[in-house]
């Protein structure tokens, strides 16, 4: 599979996350163009702050390949990795990261900071912007829907005392 097709699989995972009420982020770990593992965010449904798509995909790939060193693998993810996920990428030795949309709030591949430029023992190649418009559209639609749901929900107001 090409990077474009692999990112398509990540976008499908992101759509699954959105359908569950999760922030729509999807990731795939691939080796030689073949998907080894795919995942999407499950932080809300699993009530676990660590359940980002990237970490879940890395975990599944490690289990499938029988080791923690994924130096022959690439990670394609719909949103620029956060600090936690960037740490997982470094520790698992992913050789290349391709992401779609930039994350101006928590992105660690250059948007907020670049963890991969720091003197760690591993530095993956990073490519950005692949199918970014599609990834951004999923995120924007999700957060618009979330804002609309919150606006429609009555808010508690304290009783007025005379």
Segments and roles (model prediction):
Residues 1-20, 84, 88-162:
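Zinc-dependent deaminase
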Residues 10, 14-17, 27, 37, ...:
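Small-residue (primarily alanine) positions within well-ordered alpha-helices
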Residues 21-25, 71:
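Short, basic and Ser/Thr-rich N-terminal targeting/leader segments
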Residues 25-33:
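Short beta-strand scaffold segments in enzyme catalytic cores
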Residues 36-43, 123:
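Short beta->alpha transition motifs characteristic of CBS
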Residues 43, 77, 101:
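Residues that line or immediately flank small-molecule/substrate-binding pockets and catalytic motifs
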Residues 45-55:
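A short, polar/charged loop-to-alpha-helix boundary motif
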Residues 67-80:
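Immediate flanking context of iron-sulfur cluster ligation sites
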